[in-house]
Amino acid sequence: MKAALLLVIFSLMLIGVLTKKSGYPTDHEGCKNWCVLNHSCGILCEGYGGSGYCYFWKLACWCDDIHNWVPTWSRATNKCRAK
């Protein structure tokens, strides 16, 4: 019984640790990371534990499978001030 309980607890902890997300990672001002080439986005996204590319139509880095703690851009919470 104790072993089953421990297994459930560790499984829930592991699920929380391994959860990943996708999106536009933001800089310290809340703006999307500007790009033109895929290489720079690949390096940025690898630093966040995922992979990515430059979404050329929007000139912004898109990352897949990045950690949940990475702040990502959202229209609802947009704090970016255009320069």
UniProtKB/Swiss-Prot annotation:
Coiled coil: none annotated. Gene3D superfamilies: Knottin, scorpion toxin-like (3.30.30.10). The keyword Protease does not apply. Residues 83 form a propeptide. GO terms for molecular function: sodium channel inhibitor activity; toxin activity. CDD domains: neurotoxins_LC_scorpion. InterPro entries: LCN-type_CS_alpha_beta_dom (IPR044062), Scorpion_toxin-like_sf (IPR036574), Scorpion_toxinL (IPR018218), Scorpion_toxinL/defensin (IPR002061). GO terms for cellular component: extracellular region. Disulfide bonds join C31-C80, C35-C54, C41-C61, C45-C63. Residues 1-19 form the signal peptide. It is found in: Secreted. Keywords: Disulfide bond, Ion channel impairing toxin, Neurotoxin, Secreted, Signal, Toxin, Voltage-gated sodium channel impairing toxin. Expressed by the venom gland. Residues 21-81 form the LCN-type CS-alpha/beta domain. The keyword Secreted applies. Has the structural arrangement of an alpha-helix connected to antiparallel beta-sheets by disulfide bonds (CS-alpha/beta). This toxin increases the peak sodium current, slows down the inactivation of sodium channels (Nav), and prolongs the action potential of dorsal root ganglion neurons, which indicates that it behaves as a classical alpha-toxin. It binds to mammal brain and insect sodium channels, but with a different manner. This peptide may bind to a distinct receptor site on mammal brain sodium channels, which is unconnected with that for BmKAS (a beta-toxin), BmKIT2 (a beta-toxin) or BmK I (an alpha toxin). Belongs to the long (4 C-C) scorpion toxin superfamily. Sodium channel inhibitor family. Beta subfamily. This is Toxin BmKBT. It comes from Olivierus martensii (Manchurian scorpion).
